[in-house]
Amino acid sequence: MNIHAATPEHSPLGKTVSYQDQYDPSLLFPIARQTKRDEIGVDEAALPFAGVDIWTGFELSWLNARGKPQIGIATFRIPAGSPRLIESKSFKLYLNSYNQTRMDGIDALAAQLARDLSAAAGAEVAVSIALPQAFAAERIAELAGECIDELDIAVDNYAPCPEILSADSTAIVSETLCSNLLKSNCLVTGQPDWGSVSIRYTGPKIDREALLRYLIGFRRHNEFHEQCVERIFVDVLRACAPTKLTVYARYTRRGGLDINPWRSNCDAAPTDNVRTARQ
């Protein structure tokens, strides 16, 4: 593991790799957040948001002390204030390295995951693991908010364009808007990433048609999930001047992992972590 954060092009993305089934934390590939934050004028020493990247690992498996396979669903919470994010394919390869690794128990596994991921991210990563007897409690729900996807608009731009965002300064509101039409593409491979996004704010009333066009504008944009959400947050904050703003996206899984970035200037943490139907 190179914690000096190499560039995405050096990651396992788009490359043929061998799958290791014995524990190997060196598979993790951290990437500095600041490089992409520079593009949107954000300094990690003075972030305009708090936040967390919630990852769900649906394909976690290991061996118990007697060699019997075990499974679980893991939730990882990586602080947005960490200097590094973790590239998703390397994350998958790292989790796969537990497949033939014996662990003394669920607590030991969670502690080891947290230790390795915290070292990679440069900040404390919280880990929880749901065992099969808890799977029945898993539920599905859509993101909160009024969906704007049925607005009858014409669209001819498929790149982020914050200039089209606008808000009515004579109408101050508190509302939550959401869309299931968020699509971006992997920064390295160009593979499509599908998501839903919720925007909760207090401030001048945002033009909904303009917001929907703006979100659709990510359709040909190549960036990691976390970077897209931070770009949305910063663009809406600057163009529409809300006093309170929370942006929360939930992306469909790839390689057994989904990524759900959450950014806010008014809340300490997301109130829920419920997967959507597409997840």
UniProtKB/Swiss-Prot annotation:
Active site: 186 (thioimide intermediate), 193 (proton donor)
rRNA-binding listed as a keyword: no
Keyword Endoplasmic reticulum (UniProt): no
Binding site for NADPH: 88-89, 254-255
InterPro entries, alphabetized: GTP-CH-I_C/QueF (IPR043133), NADPH_dep_7-cyano-7-deazaG_red (IPR050084), QueF (IPR029500), QueF_N (IPR029139), QueF_type2 (IPR016428)
Catalytic activity: 7-aminomethyl-7-carbaguanine + 2 NADP(+) = 7-cyano-7-deazaguanine + 2 NADPH + 3 H(+)
Gene3D superfamilies: 3.30.1130.10
SUPFAM superfamilies attached to this UniProt entry: Tetrahydrobiopterin biosynthesis enzymes-like
Family matches, as PANTHER family: NADPH-DEPENDENT 7-CYANO-7-DEAZAGUANINE REDUCTASE
Subunit structure of this chain's protein: Homodimer.
Name by which UniProt lists this protein: NADPH-dependent 7-cyano-7-deazaguanine reductase
Native organism: Chromobacterium violaceum (strain ATCC 12472 / DSM 30191 / JCM 1249 / CCUG 213 / NBRC 12614 / NCIMB 9131 / NCTC 9757 / MK)
Lineage: Bacteria, Pseudomonadati, Pseudomonadota, Betaproteobacteria, Neisseriales
